């Protein structure tokens, strides 16, 4: 114990013991001891580091006098860690509040990195670009296309200054170069600026983009103000290297309207003159930098005014030059002029003499012209009259703006036009001659103005010409509401059309004050709408506008008095400006001033239209209109005199202008002076009429129109009656006015407009009251260019509708009819243009066809004055969305395959789309003859296409139909009446549909075959005649049988096509689809309106069922809508039907109204549709909508018995075999086959269900295989594929058939697989997506069968059987009908086994092994589409080339991926010959050579679609 005690109690001893032990331990190396030592050292080291970390940051270490011990350090560490954790908890709690605990800021990102950038850009509403120090764009995001219409590739590695406005280069350099200028200066010094500096710059919008095709050169200089947020050199990038330090990283977004800086009130440009005062150079960079539209017009008018205005006997310019030479500098007094939009501009000029630096001799003098736009005020009218008179007359002729100038004074109108004004102006500029002719010529002053405006503002003329413009509702509320519009630089172009009418009230004010003196003033606002109309008719809503706008205007408005003042001046001005048109008339009467002014006004209009443009169809129209006006003036001579003031307003009519307006400045005089002048002028007018009238009959008509037609109203337009009328009408709602006017125009136009385009106008104007000018314009328009007017009309209508829905909301009911009217009017105008409907009809057809086929309409539309008036007739046709307008004809051509469907839809589904129901009901769909009848009868309500349709009906139908309008304008009216409600909501949808229709029409036109089928139908409604042949016919054939089936099952499909058409107006299409589909009642209504139930019932009871169950949704629109990219699921039907409708047509004829363009080469027509589709590959964008629609349609259709589907398939197959054209036989065969199939269908369906289950399993396997190959197969497709295996097998049999027929793959399939087709679909019926599945599986199945059978032909056969309704078209469409046939095969596969006919085929197809093998191989092979082409070739022996097989493969993939399909279809469509089908198919295959690659690409290709 002692020892223990000692040890424990004696530290010295224990220490000694330890020491003793220590040495003994240390005698040898001890791993344990060395490890402990090492650990202690490390521990000390870490503690020190920890101390540094813990205390260094908090400066706590200084608080310790001695080095903290480990314990203190650890304690502090724990403390700080706790604090950090508490802070994190608190932060997390806050974050939970903000994020609702859904996402942790530190959690894994829910958004994919790749998607984050685009999402951010979308949220910012901008695009991203990086510019290096040299100013080259190193990178730009893909969405730049949305803003600048440039593709990413176009801008990459190009100079940013090429798209920057010259005025913004310095600003951009300032933001870009600081880095390069820093030269070693620390970047940190610039951090505040670099981190985020925001600046605005103007970026050039691609002038060559399709949307701008129709714009004139001014459009080519269109800039978009972008707000750029720039970061010069983020730290993260800075560290990566020098290269990045010199980059400017920017996000550019459109400057929100509310954020847009107020445009500078003053604008300026400089000129350089020699000592004689001759301008040697002109610098407009400052003006251009202002980015105000119409700056060219501003410069032109300013210079004209400066040089032409008389100040005593010397012009400002001359006096200015003398002063400069004498004093070395000069300041001009303030002078005023008006722009084409009616904006008054005050200007003064400063000049300075420039001397030679060496000799000190004066060399030249520089002039700075400072311009100030004034807000239009009614009171300013008189002032404007004088100042503007000079500039306006000359300008109207010279520039689109000038044309618009006639209505320019109406600032209100400008507002309406402002939406489309900008691009309309370019459009107008494109065809300045036509435009100016229209705008300048007072004869159809209103019409001229409208027309001029129309070319300039595609949509505006519509407005002017349409009743809406005439109606106070449109005009007076609008113009009153937006007087500023007139002043808006942007407004001028739009002014032309809508602006004119809108601004006509202002014009009335100005006109009345200036041109009409007291009378106009009396009109004041009471007859503002009337005044607007008058102003419109005068071409210049405002007095100044009148004189400037055109002689007509001068006469009819305050401009008239100013005309007297500067009559010769105006003539001079107009000479240069009007391209001699206006000048001629004006020059003829310059000396006469007022008296001459009046005649000149009328003559000028007539002369401009008639004399100068007389040779021109447009001129002729103008002449007619002017004649009518003249006659009216003559007949209602006293009336105009009586109301001097009103005449200017209503003076849009010749009478008005002649009487009161004619005196313009004299207007204040009242009737007396006016009367004398008016008598004198009337004699001249009468003489002119006699001289210019095409025939005594014409003259008689014109006279009747002027006198018998409501002289009072006509006069009212031109005389005291006008104010009253205007006043009376004004109280009436604009809609009523418009409707009345539309009805009058439509009813009248049918009979009168055609015979006497001009004549109609006065009458219309009369009815319109305030709308005189609008009507007049319409006629004039008709007179213009049969082709151009409609195109322009459509464009304008569309533009107006889209850009100014609010404006048109009032008149929407009218506007809807207006849309129909638009078309009707266009057609009528086309008829009218020839002065007789018949005369112009061929021309119209040719021109329209040309325009449609060329897709010129966008360009022609601005340049087609004729078109503007029709739009006016349509009563502002604002219903037509700009897109529709542009795309109406161009759209026809532009639209994708869906367009074609759309067109059908429009025609067939006019219940939904005003045109469609009637088309179907009227039998337009049924056959060519009926279609015509339908257009006239069904559209009978509309009466004449453009003019007869009731305003409400016409407008709605017109909206749809105008684009298709030309196609089915007549048909549209009645459906339109049913559809008026729809047009309001349909403006968006309808435009899409229109474009689609147009696209269809285009395709059809291209095909010619389709067009020919229905040319007759269309011909009756002359308006459609021009395009109808090519456009309408396209739809008609499908409409015959397909129409009802198609529409029966695919009302939504019809709408869907618009959705598919999205590319042109995806938003509109989507909204259209949404509005159409959002309520089932609407769809049912549409179906009923289309007569789909009846058509389906009578045409193909079985087919109908099949169709509704499968075809309409799948084939019709579902496919197109459903698969924008996978066109074949969504568009396979379309593509097949469109691309190769012949095969599918026969079968589809019953099965799918749409697909059933079955008349042998209606199919081709359908091809046209696909052709459009290719054009509409972009339209595939609305795939989501389409898919939804398709699913919905398919769901409905699939719910129907598979038997029916199978029956439909069999029908289709049989017709295919006999050739689609034999529809009757096909129907019989189809019915027989269907009956047979129906008998075995139940069994088949049961078996198919079982088989399908097996197939689905197999399909799943195949899907796996396909996926492995990169061909992702959607479940639907998988299911379809499962069904397809049998079909695949079937293809062998169909294969033979395929080989037998030009479209053997499909045809053979169709024949062999009709029952299977049906039955396969029946089995598919359970699967709502079955159609899609079939589409996809058709594609893949085709490939699978290819793989299994090693032959595309076999594949085609399979698909023919399986997918006969939907895919068969595809199959038929494509040389390797693998695509469409696969669908058939899918269908046939399941159903065929039971089908006695199909049993052989089905034998192997149905064998599960076969199916599996096929499915697997098919899918596997699908990636190897190119490889398959060999097989395909075999299968498509009919298409001996591998290319067709390739195509088939492509088709399959394309169907799946939509892209290839679209391409293929478009190829087929381009072929535009059913007969060519075989060749086409092979050709398509070849065309699809790339497609094959795409097919191989499969999913990838889908992306492209």
UniProtKB/Swiss-Prot annotation:
Record's subcellular location? Nucleus
Q: Where is the bHLH domain?
A: 27-84
Key word Kinase present: no
Which SMART domains does this entry report, sorted A to Z?
DUF1518, HLH, PAS
Residue stretches making up the PAS domain? 113-183
Motif LXXLL motif 1: chain residues: 630-634
Q: Where is this motif: LLXXLXXXL motif?
A: 1069-1077
GO BP terms, alphabetized: cellular response to hormone stimulus; chordate embryonic development; granulocyte differentiation; myeloid cell differentiation; positive regulation of transcription by RNA polymerase II; primitive hemopoiesis; regulation of DNA-templated transcription; regulation of lipid metabolic process
Q: What's any one GO cellular component for it?
A: nucleus
Q: Where is this motif: LXXLL motif 2?
A: 686-690
According to UniProt, the tissues expressing it are described as: Expressed ubiquitously in the embryo and in many adult tissues including the brain, gills, liver, swim bladder and skin. Shows highest expression in the ovary and testis, and lower expression in the intestine, eye and skin. Only isoform E20b is expressed in the muscle and heart.
Presence of keyword Acyltransferase:
no
Per the record, where are the segments of Polar residues compositional bias? Answer: 1-11, 396-424, 444-457, 580-590, 835-857, 1372-1384, 1408-1436
UniProt domain comment: Contains 3 Leu-Xaa-Xaa-Leu-Leu (LXXLL) motifs. The LXXLL motifs are essential for the association with nuclear receptors and are, at least in part, functionally redundant.
Oligomer status and interactors: Interacts with the thyroid hormone receptors thraa and thrb (via the ligand-binding domain).
Which family does the UniProt entry place this protein in? Belongs to the SRC/p160 nuclear receptor coactivator family.
This chain's protein is named: Nuclear receptor coactivator 2
State the species of origin.
Danio rerio (Zebrafish)
